[in-house]
Amino acid sequence: MKIIPYRKRSVLIATIFAISAVGITGCSDNTETKAVERVEEAAALARVKDLEARAEALKSNMPAANDMTATAGGTDTASGKPTIKMPDESTIPDDEFGAAVRRGLQISNHTYKELPNNVGNQLNCTSCHLGNGSEAYAAPWNNTPSVYPNYSKRTGRINTIQERINGCFERSLNGKALDLNSDDMNAMVSYMSWLSQDMPFGVSPEGSGFVKVDKTLEPNTDNGKKLFAEKCSVCHGATGEGQYNDDGTYVYPAIAGDKSFNDGAGMARTYTAASFIKGKMPFGQGGSLSDQEAVDIASYFTHLPRPIKANKDKDWPNGDAPKDVRR
């Protein structure tokens, strides 16, 4: 079913209004007005019928309020929401904006190599934002530009998209913020905008964020340690140190230790990490763990030694911090 352009919606509204107006005029009781001649009545009735037919034709092509099937990025038929999709790289324009998009993609996939002065570990943006930042249920960036500026409970104020990106640099990348007006910051925002080209403004695509887990579950860290050894250590190492090539690039990223994110990162929170694990881990086997197993594993590895985020006491200034926030 196709989305009707705004102008057609306006025509429909005007048509319905016209029908109502004709009906009201025909029913008005004005003793000073002579009765409408039969021929005029017939003409008025014909106009009403014509308007009704046009209105029905428009309504038959108009989707329900949540029907987004005309989205170019694809649609999840169950939810009616647009789906996450990496646009074809051939659509990147051959101009200054396109150059910024390509730079943003390069930074996203090779962050600590491209920006060594801003990254304090050996991770990339796409260590968590999988698939070039465009994989469903791996915190994809598709449509991210349309939700910022936005209120952040963690900072207690409105944040711009640039400030949100810098939050990741200071926490997930254990590094330093980019200059808000730098070419590299603009490149990252440009890349996110390009990713979002097929997304309707203000609509959360199917696959945004992470999968949901039951946050009422109490973690069993001992079981998490056992499961980590069985299901996670083969890639991430016995202590979460990851596997790295001689040139410093990783085969599997560190999820603990100095090469990993600090304790102020979202991924250092038990239930946030559990949501990522449930949807995407073990690698290639996402969805194979129960909520309880994901929570147990997350509780174990998020509390392994890792860098300490300075000034965490200033987070959540209004006292509404989730229970898994590190202090």
Swiss-Prot record:
InterPro entries named among the record's database cross-references: Cyt_c-like_dom, Cyt_c-like_dom_sf, Cytochrome_c-type_DH
Sequence positions that bind heme c 1: C125, C128, H129
Single annotated GO MF: heme binding
Low complexity bias: start-end ranges: 66-78
Main location: periplasm
Binding site for heme c 2: C232, C235, H236
Annotated ranges, domain Cytochrome c: 99-196, 219-305
Endpoints of the signal sequence: 1-26
PTM characteristics: Binds 2 heme c groups covalently per subunit.
Enzyme kind, highest EC tier: oxidoreductase
EC number of the protein: 1.8.2.2
Positions of the UniProt region annotated as Disordered: 66-93
GO CC terms, sorted: periplasmic space
Classification via PROSITE patterns: CYTC, PROKAR_LIPOPROTEIN
Annotated catalysed reactions: 2 thiosulfate + 2 Fe(III)-[cytochrome c] = tetrathionate + 2 Fe(II)-[cytochrome c] + 2 H(+)
Entry's localization field: Periplasm
Keywords linked to the UniProt accession: Heme, Iron, Metal-binding, Oxidoreductase, Periplasm, Repeat, Signal
Notes on temperature effects: Optimum temperature is 20 degrees Celsius.
Mutant phenotype after disruption: Cells are unable to produce tetrathionate from thiosulfate.
Subunit structure, as described in the record: Monomer.
Protein function: Catalyzes the oxidation of 2 molecules of thiosulfate to tetrathionate.
Name of the molecule in the record: Thiosulfate dehydrogenase
Organism: Psychrobacter arcticus (strain DSM 17307 / VKM B-2377 / 273-4)
